[in-house]
């Protein structure tokens, strides 16, 4: 049975941990507000750019642009994985790494078996996980979210598109956490390249009569790199917001668990103290009776 001193030490340790988790929750909440605002602000631009491409692609033969071209055989795949730099965010990293692993070993098992899967990892956690397991890493971006910059998104998008244009890969897939709400980030695995020109209904509804100068094909050539960079940037912002939400929830849960543990320890402490007092009183009474006897 634990002594009073042991229980006091545990209570002190739990209180210290509770203070840390509570502070981390508050920091994550402040960061979440900023990250959420940035992610939400990026969505309309990315969405409208995608709509504009759908509208333009209805006016031209998209097969003339290699970024629209679907390869007859997919032999080489580039997987872009976005994780966090730090832990203490619940299952945020574990779940997205599992999805990336599943994407590689199930969706592209044949390509992986022939050495046809390479990766770009944004975020320390994913980078370290796959580096330790000797996956083919084209580029890693550890500690990228400590100072999140559009230049990194641009570099990743340009690297992926150049690899696709040179025929080094036949498909580019991005795996990330999309921010939906504080309680429920959504795991996503999407094809980034080749770019889909939109389904028939989207083309029909992309609407109206527009005049394009100099011509739709030339505009598409300019917009495609912007579209890819914007999508990668949006994905990184979404992941950052989802990370802060996951960390805030994890620290809130840890704080509540510490509170419950303190309650249990205090009960144990009071019981042990009461037992010690009872024992002392019994010894005093026994001693008094022995003297009187």
From Swiss-Prot:
GO molecular function terms listed in the Swiss-Prot or TrEMBL record: ATP binding; proton-transporting ATP synthase activity, rotational mechanism
Membrane topology label: Peripheral membrane protein
A Pfam family annotated for this UniProt entry: ATP-synt
Family of the protein in this entry: Belongs to the ATPase gamma chain family.
Function comment: Produces ATP from ADP in the presence of a proton gradient across the membrane. The gamma chain is believed to be important in regulating ATPase activity and the flow of protons through the CF(0) complex.
Quaternary data: F-type ATPases have 2 components, CF(1) - the catalytic core - and CF(0) - the membrane proton channel. CF(1) has five subunits: alpha(3), beta(3), gamma(1), delta(1), epsilon(1). CF(0) has three main subunits: a, b and c.
Name of this chain's protein: ATP synthase gamma chain
Source organism of the structure: Chlorobium chlorochromatii (strain CaD3)
The encoding gene: atpG
């Amino acid at each position: 049975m634990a002594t009073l001193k042991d229980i006091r030490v545990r209570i002190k340790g739990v209180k210290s941990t509770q203070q840390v988790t509570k502070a981390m929750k508050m920091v994550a909440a402040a960061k979440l507000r900023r990250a959420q605002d940035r992610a939400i602000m990026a969505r309309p631009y990315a969405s409208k750019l995608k709509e504009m491409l759908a509208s333009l692609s209805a006016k031209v033969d998209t097969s003339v642009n290699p970024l629209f071209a679907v390869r007859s055989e997919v032999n080489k795949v580039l997987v872009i994985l976005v994780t966090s730099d730090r832990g203490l965010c619940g299952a945020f990293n574990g779940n997205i790494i599992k999805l990336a692993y599943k994407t590689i070993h199930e969706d592209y098992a044949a390509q992986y078996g022939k050495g046809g899967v390479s990766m770009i990892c944004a975020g320390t956690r994913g980078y370290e996980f796959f580096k330790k397991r000797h996956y083919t890493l084209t580029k890693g971006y550890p500690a990228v979210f400590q100072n999140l910059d559009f230049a990194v998104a641009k570099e990743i998008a340009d690297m992926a598109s150049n690899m696709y244009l040179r025929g080094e890969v036949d498909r580019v897939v991005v795996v990330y956490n999309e921010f939906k709400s504080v309680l429920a980030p959504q795991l996503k695995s999407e094809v980034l390249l080749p770019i889909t020109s939109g389904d028939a209904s989207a083309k029909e509804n992309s609407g109206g009569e527009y005049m394009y100068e100099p011509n739709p094909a030339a505009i598409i050539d300019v917009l495609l790199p912007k579209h890819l960079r914007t999508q990668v940037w949006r994905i990184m912002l979404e992941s950052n917001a989802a990370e802060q939400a996951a960390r805030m929830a994890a620290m809130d849960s840890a704080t509540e668990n510490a509170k419950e543990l303190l309650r249990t320890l205090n009960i144990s402490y009071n019981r042990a103290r009461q037992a010690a007092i009872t024992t002392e009183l019994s010894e005093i009474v026994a001693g008094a009776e022995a003297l009187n006897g």
